[in-house]
């Protein structure tokens, strides 16, 4: 780790010792570090290193399992990506779909082995509730300035979830859009213009989104 003076130091995180694959790191708005261990399957977990004033005071917490709001166990074999939305909720992509944590600070407690999570539940045309992207491999999650979640999948294209998580705003795939492939690797959003860049196994496309970043000064608006 480099400090602002450019001096190097190391941080020993016990829960990361011996882990092979760290494939995502999320620094949250309160400066906690969420670290995703994806492989091997036996080691798949999430580690949170808490915000602290010094490296010596940093504390880490590890957890693997979740209980959803229907009191069902949710234990994926692989954690793939993370994002923080405008409400401070932490979104987590897995091989079984996407979940989010409405109170992520509970992850930094000793009794966190079965964290409470929320799975997005929508209503189909027959009026029957279902879990959004259930058992779908999630590859990337990005949040735009309108708090919509852009969710990339391994084979099903891109889904855009509404700000309140109650409806699918857009669904992009090779059949209904210029998307080059339904196997999505990455999504990035230009906050100033709203443009969304989507990377896949067959190349890059962009979409002109509607949610742009607000200004600090609107004195030129009449």
Locate each region found by the language model.
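Conserved beta-propeller blade signature
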Residues: 32-36, 89-93, 148-152, 194-198
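Hydrophobic beta-strand positions in blades of beta-propellers and related beta-sheet-rich domains
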Residues: 1, 43-47, 63, 98, ...
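Short loop/turn segments immediately following beta-strands, especially the blade-tip
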Residues: 1, 49-58, 101-117, 162-168, ...
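Blade-level signature of beta-propeller repeat domains, shared across WD40, Kelch, NHL, RCC1
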Residues: 96-99, 104, 183-221
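Short coil-to-beta transitions that initiate beta-strands within beta-rich domains
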Residues: 7-30, 65-86, 121-146, 174-190, ...
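Short loop/turn segments immediately following the C-termini of beta-strands
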Residues: 30, 38-41, 46, 95-96, ...
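Long, internal scaffold/assembly segments composed of regular secondary structure
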Residues: 15, 24-26, 34-37, 42-53
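Long, C-terminal catalytic modules of enzymes
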Residues: 146-147, 151-155, 160-163
């Amino acid at each position: 780790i480099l400090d602002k003076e450019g001096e190097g130091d190391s941080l020993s995180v016990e829960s990361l010792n011996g882990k092979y694959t760290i494939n995502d790191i999320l620094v949250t708005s309160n400066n906690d570090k969420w670290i995703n261990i994806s492989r091997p399957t036996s080691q798949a977990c999430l580690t949170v290193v808490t915000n602290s004033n010094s490296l010596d005071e940093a504390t880490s917490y590890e957890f693997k399992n979740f209980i959803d709001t229907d009191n069902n166990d949710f234990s994926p074999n692989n954690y793939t990506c993370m994002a923080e939305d405008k409400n401070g909720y932490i979104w987590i992509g897995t091989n079984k779909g996407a979940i989010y944590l409405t109170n992520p600070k509970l992850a930094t407690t000793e009794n966190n082995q079965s964290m409470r999570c929320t799975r997005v539940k929508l209503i189909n045309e027959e009026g029957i509730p279902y879990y959004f992207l259930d058992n779908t491999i999630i590859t990337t999650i990005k949040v735009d300035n309108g708090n919509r979640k852009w969710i990339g999948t391994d084979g099903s294209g891109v889904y855009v979830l509404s700000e309140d998580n109650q409806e699918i705003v857009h669904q992009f795939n090779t059949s209904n859009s210029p998307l080059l492939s339904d196997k999505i690797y990455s999504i990035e959003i230009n906050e100033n213009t709203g443009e969304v860049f989507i990377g896949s196994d067959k190349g890059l496309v962009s979409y002109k989104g509607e949610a742009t970043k607000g200004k600090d000064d609107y004195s030129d608006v009449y």
